[in-house]
């Protein structure tokens, strides 16, 4: 460390209170700037990694974003259902390689229940075309068996062999529960960092079975016992949506057009990638607003540092004069003020980074639980390094203003007593 840098460091230590406040101002600015950027990018990554390898999502006539949100992210509700015969027709279409039926509408203690079949565990992909795997047990086979997402099992303390009660609708209240039809947990999926972790999976037949006597949307009378229902043969009447994989992506647009003009019922077919792009387009204004607010906070922090340096410079006129009297040249005084600004900014950045990672470690499980966004404590990205470099350079530039004022002061200025 050079003599000027050592002197700058000792000068800041001598003015601890002011220096700490300035450092905290810069640190808060850095936390907000990088926090917004990290949440923005990782939210995108989390959404994009939720589903892969699916060529089309089919649901009742609806907008692209709405269909994507309720079928993949379990956000919102479907406008219409798909008739089971329509599902069978498209599942057996010559262009279709596989199809996954999805039936939504029930819940368990705040977690969505999804009816599906074996195709879901075989063909559903997330991330870089990763398949679902089990951390415990296996997929359901019996009527009243269920497979839990990792978050459901972890947060509610379930394990293979536990029994759960499903509630009708998304509000888990006493009068809406299927109390006499408990489901046995037979499998728990490995964590995926997607809405799969927050889902209770049952068979399509189970969805039909638990709604016997609930055809009007409410319990009309005594419901059959579980054993009586097991002896019946259930077939779905409707599903909420279906995920489709094609034999060749060349056929995507042709099949999409065929579904969108399907004469038997109003349906919509969307491509997940295009729907996600539309979703980001809708969110771009909010993203830009957040980044603008973060930028203004950084500017405010740097202006606070400028104010602190200018105020301290007025109080340090005698100190500067003594340095000049001891042989320091104007350029040395200039370098001293620049070094102080640089050190304040650098320490503020380091403090901000430490604070950011501490906050992320605390809020990570909370955001994962409530919003399904997986925040990672990863190393800084090149763009984040660039933002920090900008803050550091801006701090040095800010330091030029008091440094130039000190540079212009003569020896007699500091020795003159001002009243």
Identify what each model region corresponds to:
Residues 35-122, 139-142, 231, 259, ...:
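Hydrophobic, regular-secondary-structure patches
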């Amino acid at each position: 460390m050079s003599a000027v840098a050592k002197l700058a460091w000792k000068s800041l230590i001598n003015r601890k209170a002011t220096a700490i406040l300035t450092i905290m101002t810069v640190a808060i600015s850095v936390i907000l700037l990088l926090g917004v950027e990290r949440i923005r990018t990782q939210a995108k990554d989390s959404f994009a990694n939720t589903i892969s390898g699916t060529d089309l999502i089919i649901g009742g006539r609806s907008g692209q974003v709405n269909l994507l949100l309720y079928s993949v992210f379990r956000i919102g509700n479907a406008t219409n259902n798909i008739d089971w015969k329509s599902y069978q027709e498209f599942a057996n279409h010559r262009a279709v390689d596989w199809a996954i039926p999805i039936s939504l509408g029930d819940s368990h203690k705040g977690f969505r229940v999804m009816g599906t079949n074996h195709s879901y565990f075989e063909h559903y992909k997330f991330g870089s075309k990763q398949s679902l795997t089990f951390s415990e047990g296996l997929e359901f086979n019996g009527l009243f068996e269920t497979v839990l997402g990792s978050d459901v099992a972890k947060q509610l303390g379930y394990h293979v062999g536990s029994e759960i009660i499903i509630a009708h609708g998304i509000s888990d209240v006493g009068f809406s529960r299927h109390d006499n039809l408990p489901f046995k947990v037979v499998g728990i999926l490995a964590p995926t960092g997607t809405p799969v972790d927050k889902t209770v999976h049952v068979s399509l037949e189970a969805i039909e079975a638990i709604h016997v006597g609930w055809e009007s949307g409410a319990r009309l009378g005594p419901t059959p016992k579980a054993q009586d229902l097991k002896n019946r043969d259930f077939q779905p009447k409707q599903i909420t949506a279906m995920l489709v994989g094609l034999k060749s992506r060349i056929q995507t647009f042709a099949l999409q057009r065929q579904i969108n003009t399907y004469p038997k019922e109003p349906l919509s077919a969307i491509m997940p990638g295009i729907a996600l792009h539309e979703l980001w387009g809708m969110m771009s204004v909010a993203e830009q607003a957040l980044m603008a607010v973060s930028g203004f906070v950084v500017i405010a922090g740097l202006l606070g540092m400028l104010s602190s340096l200018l105020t301290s410079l007025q109080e340090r006129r005698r100190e500067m004069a003594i340095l000049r009297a001891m042989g320091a040249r104007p350029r040395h005084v200039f370098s001293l003020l620049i070094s102080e600004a640089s050190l304040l900014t650098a320490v503020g950045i380091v403090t901000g980074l430490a604070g950011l990672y501490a906050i992320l470690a605390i809020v990570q499980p909370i955001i994962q639980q409530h919003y399904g966004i997986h925040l990672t404590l990863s190393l800084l990205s090149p763009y984040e390094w660039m933002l920090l470099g900008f803050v550091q350079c801006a701090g040095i530039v800010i330091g030029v203003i008091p440094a130039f004022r000190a540079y212009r002061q003569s020896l007699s200025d500091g020795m003159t007593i001002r009243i």
